[in-house]
């Protein structure tokens, strides 16, 4: 199954939407702390409805703890600074799709730790800055699922 990682997300409703997405697809959600909201934020619950109980959500105190938890998995960083299109990447069924915060994206130290080939972007108009985080996660996750439909770890669509 796919893994979604959010690095220090800031907006509770986005994370709630992503929880719902992960519950419906079976993707594992990794939340890398600190979060920009309280875990019991009513906006998080409202956006995620009652889906949190059906999602596999893993909390990590920091980047190092996250890396330890996903050791051995390929990490794809979604970034507006990526030189490769999502559609040029071959995403494995157990790979991690990493997204930065809504306000700052991924920090420079993470960019420095990853190879350029691991940094991918969603194609969009040159004058556009970025997509909403929960929308971007949905687009990328379903592309990864599409690429792995025949894998035993893919969800049944």
Task: Please identify what each model-predicted range represents.
Residues 1-157:
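Post-transcriptional modification and biogenesis factors for structured RNAs
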């Amino acid at each position: 199954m796919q893994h979604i990682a959010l690095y220090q997300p800031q907006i509770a409703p986005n994370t709630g939407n992503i929880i719902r997405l992960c519950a419906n697809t079976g993707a594992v959600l990794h939340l890398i702390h600190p979060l920009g909201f309280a875990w019991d934020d009513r906006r998080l619950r409202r956006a995620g409805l009652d889906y949190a109980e059906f999602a596999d959500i893993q909390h990590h105190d920091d980047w190092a703890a996250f890396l330890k938890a996903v050791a051995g998995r390929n990490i794809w960083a979604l970034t507006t600074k990526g030189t490769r299109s999502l559609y040029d990447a071959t995403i494995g069924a157990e790979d991690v799709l990493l997204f930065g915060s809504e306000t700052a994206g991924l920090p420079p130290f993470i960019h420095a730790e990853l190879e350029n080939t691991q940094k991918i972007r969603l194609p969009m108009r040159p004058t556009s800055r970025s997509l909403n985080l929960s929308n971007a996660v949905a687009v990328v996750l379903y592309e990864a699922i599409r690429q792995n439909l025949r894998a035993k770890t893919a969800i049944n669509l």
